[in-house]
Amino acid sequence: MTTSKQSLFTHPIHLGLGATAIAQPEMTGMEFYAAYSERTASDGVEGRLVSMYRFDESWDSWEMHPSGDEVVLLVEGSMTLLQEMPDGSVATTILGPGDYAINAPGVWHTADVTEPATALFITAGLGTDHRPR
């Protein structure tokens, strides 16, 4: 299916079974994710959400994806990714434009932002959890 041009900032893409790429409805905040999970549940752990965000400040929570890897690709600016490892240690990775990091399944992660940053995410979102920072 061919769709008209969309902005990844407002309309994420679902990568699904059978090598499909499905444009998603407009991102509306946290309620988007609940509806997305329902729409794509039949893809199970193989489904991926491709999204892009601009950050002007550090994240206020940690998140974790238990079902698969998440790719974080920095497009612009600078971001420090913090990953809480299974042994409790925290790995720190500074990302610049074009750099990427992978959040492994079950690894809690957050980010510090000291200048505006834009990042692209490819997320195995099934079962994603959040906790306060």
What kind of region is each of these model predictions?
Residues 66-81, 85, 122:
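Short, conserved beta-strand element in jelly-roll/cupin
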Residues 2-15, 110-133:
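Double-stranded beta-helix
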Residues 45-46, 55-59, 78-80, 87, ...:
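Short, charged/polar surface micro-motifs in flexible loops or helix N-caps
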Residues 47, 68-71, 117:
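Short, surface-exposed beta-edge/turn micro-motifs
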Residues 85-105:
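Short acidic-glycine-tyrosine-enriched beta hairpin
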Residues 65, 86, 113-115:
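Short glycine/proline-enriched turns and hinge-like loops at secondary-structure junctions
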Residues 57-71, 88-89:
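A short beta-loop-beta micro-motif enriched in histidine and acidic residues
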